[in-house]
């Protein structure tokens, strides 16, 4: 059997293994499906060409292997010409707008989950309507403030000439963005153009250029969709808001003009002083984090207990201001309850300020850090971040009034997330937080995290709303593909399924989560009645005897009758009429989730 025929139904057969396929191969399959969908009357086998259909010679029957895309499109209704999808003004005009709008409407107009693999628990009920309304109001305020800030930055570039400043570190072309305030020396945002991503065509980093030029076979990540990092940055922020983890700075797509964008002409004309060209680029705009430092720098100043073998931590009794009886449950789980509350002193390390030098790892600070880390672990796992190290998540120390400290984490550089398949070729891309001390990871998830995430991830309404929002976000890209989007969504839901199953067991933690079998949750479309038939139909069918007026009682008349039967048996005086000619086959398309195990594994699991 050929490779193409083998791949036709690999997402339909639940017992078949997921094989390695390339992004180019899927694009070729999409072109074939698109050509077939243009002629809804002709139904031919995949191996039969147009010449064979028009020929008078009878062809031998061939086995038809329907693809998953063709199966899900059978019950779908074609969109009306007067319906169009909304467009983001920051993105601008999109190519193939008509085909894309119709595909988006078909996929997102009706997304109702009839059967879900995310079974809710009675011990963790979902949030009420009042809480959801408050969350929507806060999110609307955040969106308005973000749009106002982006407009202010665009005005600063166009009116006041405050150009963007390229960030020298990192593997992509990223720029600091400033506002209109002249006294503001700190940037207000970070802009990452689409074409200057790590694997983009105009990345200004020479290391990526060398990879693309001299090592094309090892360049890029096959599990990610090319040039979609700016959408993934925004999607990570959307997922953060949907999960209410508050780790990712607000991020969305925007278009900005600047003279400092990377100009591809400079690498061809060396030694010639070219005049800067003003370019308008599309990318992701992320709010700048103030007073945050990278995690690797933070741990260099304040190493965690057990992080370095040459750093000794001595235990002392807690200060008199702390009361162990009022310690939260999550804090007691992180320490030994048989021992009195203790303080962990870090090694003397030079700091930038006297205030920061007073910070010491205590049981309270370790508990706060553990809670923030658990949120980061679940967020990274669900969106399957393939580039999480100690250099792209940040820590902030907040000094409280009672000589205590508060720790806050933030997740940045999320562009290499949301893969369309699990890594299954060369590298596994493990999470960077797995290299933290074992005493932080080898503990179960806290009850606070279980009570927070389980009601969200087991809510059918939450998944239906999330699908609509993520579909609207990913469809902003001009190369948006419904087939690839379904694969991304299946991987995300499979990761969330593992999170739910891990949180259901109070004995499991981060280490058990990453050891779980990889899976996907595929959305299968099915037709069900829009509403159950009226009770009067069943009652009439049971009570009405077969009449003797017809020569063939089993043959129904051609014109359905609208005369009420047994109206005198009804409790009310109004007879019940039912006309079967109105919507005789009123069905709707719903989603039935199906769990599929991923058996393929990459070669190297440590990098």
UniProtKB/Swiss-Prot annotation:
Residues 167-173 are annotated as: G-loop. GO terms for biological process: endosome organization; Golgi organization; phosphatidylinositol phosphate biosynthetic process. Residues 384-392 are annotated as: Catalytic loop. InterPro entries: Lsb6/PI4K2 (IPR039756), PI3/4_kinase_cat_dom (IPR000403), PI3/4_kinase_CS (IPR018936). It catalyses: a 1,2-diacyl-sn-glycero-3-phospho-(1D-myo-inositol) + ATP = a 1,2-diacyl-sn-glycero-3-phospho-(1D-myo-inositol 4-phosphate) + ADP + H(+). Residues 161-522 form the PI3K/PI4K catalytic domain. GO terms for cellular component: cytoplasm; endosome; fungal-type vacuole membrane; plasma membrane; trans-Golgi network. Belongs to the PI3/PI4-kinase family. May play a role in endocytic and/or exocytic pathways. This is Phosphatidylinositol 4-kinase LSB6. The gene is LSB6.
């Amino acid at each position: 059997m050929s490779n193409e025929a083998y791949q036709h139904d690999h997402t339909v057969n639940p017992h078949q293994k997921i094989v390695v396929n390339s992004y180019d191969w899927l694009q070729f399959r999409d072109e074939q499906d698109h050509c077939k969908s243009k002629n809804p009357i002709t139904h031919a086998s995949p191996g039969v060409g147009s010449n064979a259909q028009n020929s008078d010679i009878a062809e031998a029957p061939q086995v038809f292997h329907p693809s998953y895309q063709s199966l899900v499109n059978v019950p779908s209704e074609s969109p009306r010409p007067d319906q169009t999808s909304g467009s983001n003004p920051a993105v601008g005009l999109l190519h193939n707008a008509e085909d894309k709008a119709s595909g988006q409407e078909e996929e997102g107009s009706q997304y109702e989950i009839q059967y879900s693999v995310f079974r809710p628990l009675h011990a963790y009920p979902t949030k009420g309507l009042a809480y959801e309304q408050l969350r929507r109001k806060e999110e609307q305020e955040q969106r308005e403030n973000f749009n106002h800030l982006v407009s202010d930055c665009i005005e600063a570039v166009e009116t006041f000439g405050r150009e963007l400043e390229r960030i020298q570190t990192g593997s992509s072309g990223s720029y600091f963005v400033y506002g209109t305030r002249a006294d503001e020396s700190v940037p207000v945002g970070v802009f990452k153009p689409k074409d200057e991503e790590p694997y983009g065509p105009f990345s200004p980093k020479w290391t990526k250029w060398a990879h693309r030029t001299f090592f094309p076979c090892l360049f890029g990540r096959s599990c990610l969709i090319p040039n979609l990092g700016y959408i993934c940055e925004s999607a990570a922020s959307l997922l953060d808001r949907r999960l209410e983890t508050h780790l990712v700075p607000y991020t969305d797509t925007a278009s900005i003009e600047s003279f400092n964008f990377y100009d591809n002409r400079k690498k061809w004309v060396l030694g010639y002083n070219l005049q800067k060209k003003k370019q308008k680029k599309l990318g992701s705009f992320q709010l700048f984090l103030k007073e945050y430092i990278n995690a690797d720098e933070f741990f260099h100043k304040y190493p965690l207990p057990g992080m370095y073998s040459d750093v000794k931590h001595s235990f002392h009794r807690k200060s008199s201001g702390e009361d162990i009886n009022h310690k939260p449950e999550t804090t007691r789980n992180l320490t030994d309850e048989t021992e009195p509350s203790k303080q962990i002193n870090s090694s003397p390390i030079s700091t930038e300020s006297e205030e920061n030098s007073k910070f010491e790892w205590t049981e309270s600070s370790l508990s706060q850090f553990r809670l923030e880390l658990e949120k980061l672990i679940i967020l990274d796992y669900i969106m399957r971040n393939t580039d999480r190290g100690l250099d792209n998540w940040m820590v902030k120390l907040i000094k409280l009034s009672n000589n205590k400290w508060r720790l806050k984490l933030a997740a940045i550089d999320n562009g290499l997330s949301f893969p369309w398949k699990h890594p299954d070729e060369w590298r596994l891309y493990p999470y960077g937080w797995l290299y933290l001390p074992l005493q932080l990871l080898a503990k179960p998830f806290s009850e606070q995290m279980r009570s927070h995430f389980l009601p969200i991830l087991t809510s059918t309404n939450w998944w239906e709303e999330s699908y609509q929002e993520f579909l609207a976000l990913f469809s902003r890209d001009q190369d948006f593909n419904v087939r690839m989007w379904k694969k991304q969504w299946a991987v995300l839901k499979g990761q969330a399924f593992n999170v739910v199953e891990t949180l259901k067991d109070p004995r499991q933690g981060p280490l058990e989560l990453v050891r779980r079998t990889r899976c996907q949750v595929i959305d299968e479309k099915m037709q069900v009645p829009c509403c159950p038939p009226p009770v009067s139909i069943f009652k009439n069918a049971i009570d009405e005897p077969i009449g003797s007026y017809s020569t063939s009682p089993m043959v129904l008349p051609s014109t359905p009758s609208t005369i009420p039967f047994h109206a005198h048996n009804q409790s009310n005086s109004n007879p019940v009429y039912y006309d079967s000619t109105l919507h005789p086959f009123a069905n709707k398309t719903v989603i039935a989730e199906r769990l599929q195990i991923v058996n393929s594994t990459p070669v190297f699991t440590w990098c």
